Amino acid sequence: MGHGLDAGLLATVAIAAYRNSRRDDLDLPATLVAIHTALNAQFNGERFATAVLAELDLASGLLAWHCAGHPAPLLLRNGRAVKTLEGGRGLPLGVGVTPEIAEERLEPGDRILLFTDGVTDARSSDGEFFGLHRLTDLVA
């Protein structure tokens, strides 16, 4: 998404579309379409945003999600990273919309780690990437 005024405007449009979708009680696929449509209407396909949209049913523990050009979340269980939550992948919002939704049943105590590629792509002074392995070691 970037930084500065353009990024702020992009985020404002995306968040407003998300909030309107929630008020209208839209499901996850329809919410993705609404955000994509709002970004396209405002920016004519010249700007985009990555995101993870997710919904957790607390009664059943069912997590549904879609990664719109964003790194996949990590499932943390019993103090360790169990797996990357693959599936539900699509293009960044504003570029295209493929509202594929993935699901995973969570167990009590599970945690979901959402992060940006800015974390995993960070480099040390020696040029070494921080990477996904270090991130999971840090948080698990």
Segment roles from a protein language model:
Residues M1-D6, A11, I15-A140:
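Conserved subregion of the PPM/PP2C metallophosphatase catalytic domain
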